[in-house]
């Protein structure tokens, strides 16, 4: 594992396995642990894969340092950078949270999403099967 992988994993653990932007549980393919039960469907595993999100993008001189990286799910990370001018992390986080509250972000793709402690999660009964 490289330095970036170690930082990503450390951040993921510090964030209790939750995406910096949407708060959904993520998984790390390099860990032996299975994807969280929040979603076992292969397509959702892609969306919820943990990535190292550079708060200050590398393309703009951002470094691979712990202070510049948070753990974010693939979906939130790619959506931030698909724009012509990616918004700041704070602006993107507010945007994601607003869309989540309206059921118009990744959580809308998951069945029976509920909010627990301000974070989206799924009830045991509504988790997708393998």
Regions found by a protein language model. Name each.
Residues 36-38, 89-92:
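Glycine-rich, phosphate-binding/catalytic loops in enzymes
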Residues 47-66, 99-126:
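Short Fe-S-cluster ligation motifs
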Residues 69-91:
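Short Cys/His-centered divalent metal-binding micro-motifs
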């Amino acid at each position: 594992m490289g330095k970036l992988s170690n930082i990503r994993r450390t951040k993921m653990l510090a964030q209790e396995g939750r995406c910096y932007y949407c708060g959904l549980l993520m998984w790390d393919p390099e860990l032996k642990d299975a994807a969280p039960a929040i979603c076992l469907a292969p397509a959702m595993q892609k969306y919820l894969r943990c990535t190292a999100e550079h708060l200050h993008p590398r393309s703009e001189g951002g470094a691979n340092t712990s202070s510049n990286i948070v753990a974010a799910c693939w979906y939130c990370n790619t959506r931030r950078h698909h724009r012509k001018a990616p918004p700041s992390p704070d602006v993107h986080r507010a945007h994601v949270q607003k869309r989540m509250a309206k059921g118009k972000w990744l959580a809308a793709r998951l069945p029976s999403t509920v909010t627990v402690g301000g974070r989206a999660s799924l009830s045991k009964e509504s988790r997708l099967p393998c």
